[in-house]
Amino acid sequence: MASEDQSAARSTGKVNWFNASKGYGFITPDDGSVELFVHQSSIVSEGYRSLTVGDAVEFAITQGSDGKTKAVNVTAPGGGSLKKENNSRGNGARRGGGGSGCYNCGELGHISKDCGIGGGGGGGERRSRGGEGCYNCGDTGHFARDCTSAGNGDQRGATKGGNDGCYTCGDVGHVARDCTQKSVGNGDQRGAVKGGNDGCYTCGDVGHFARDCTQKVAAGNVRSGGGGSGTCYSCGGVGHIARDCATKRQPSRGCYQCGGSGHLARDCDQRGSGGGGNDNACYKCGKEGHFARECSSVA
């Protein structure tokens, strides 16, 4: 306190807010001047140094090195020591005992999530958390997951642009995985207005995938909006892929030696007759009819 200019005059006021766990609070002077910061170390108390919202106190005003005024030498009216047995008892029951009460209303006996007062609260309502009501109906006392009201026009859940409704049917109160209308494709349902991207690629209906489709029909009666991406590469049909195709096309790649099919160039008995010249000769001995790895010549 040596660096602070302390006034000899003392003032009176009431505690506006105090948090024992943080060790500071605010006092509102009786003369109507600006509220003053008070630190726990400035409290003169018999026992626990704490203040209770609504406590009448007497104090001196100082100006610290930071240029801000604050209350020091805080006592009971008349200059006596404050009597605080512990941090959860006191004269008032609003922010009882400096921070142990409800952060919403300041009362003891419950915490803010169980508070029945939405956004109200004792002398420190500017610090109250408020706005913690149900996101579905806007009421306090419960969360959206426990809300029994769903879908009314005046409810908060109905003002979110419909983002909380079921993605299949568009109704609220359930999610798509619990929807019983998975196979209905009416125009007023959300699942049917997605540009058809969620339907079966074989028949175009919604509610199942192409692999589960029972309408394995020929081309022309099926959806082909994918530019042929759903057709079989083997036979050109739709409804299956090449590995499941029952029609196996002859391989287009034949023998590189003679141009025939049914064998590879290394097994071709017409080596040398394909116009390859010396390209088909052994690199070791220069003779045709075999490769270097099969050559028996040691020269």
Swiss-Prot record:
Domain CSD: 12-76
GO annotation, cellular component aspect: cytoplasm; nucleus; plasma membrane
Region (Disordered): 76-97
Tissue spec: Mostly expressed in shoot apices and siliques, and, to a lower extent, in roots, cotyledons, stems, shoots, leaves, floral buds and flowers.
Induction annotation: Accumulates during cold acclimation, but down-regulated by dehydration and salt stresses.
UniProt entry keywords in alphabetical sequence: Acetylation, Chaperone, Cytoplasm, DNA-binding, Metal-binding, Nucleus, Repeat, RNA-binding, Zinc, Zinc-finger
Pfam families attached to this UniProt entry: CSD, zf-CCHC
Domain of life: Eukaryota
Gene Ontology MF: a single term: zinc ion binding
Principal cellular location given in the protein's record: nucleus
Gene Ontology biological-process entries: cold acclimation; response to cold; response to salt stress; response to water deprivation
Keyword Aminoacyl-tRNA synthetase assigned: no
Gene3D superfamilies, alphabetized: Nucleic acid-binding proteins, Zinc finger, CCHC-type
Subcellular location: Nucleus; Cytoplasm
Keyword Repeat: yes
PANTHER family recorded: COLD SHOCK DOMAIN PROTEIN 2, COLD SHOCK DOMAIN-CONTAINING PROTEIN 3
Job description of the protein: Chaperone that binds to RNA, single- (ssDNA) and double-stranded (dsDNA) DNA, and unwinds nucleic acid duplex. Exhibits a DNA melting activity. May be involved in cold resistance. Prevents seed germination under dehydration or salt stress conditions.
Family: Belongs to the cold shock protein (CSP) family.
Protein name per Swiss-Prot or TrEMBL: Cold shock protein 1
Origin species: Arabidopsis thaliana
Organism ancestry: Eukaryota, Viridiplantae, Streptophyta, Embryophyta, Tracheophyta
Gene of this entry: CSP1
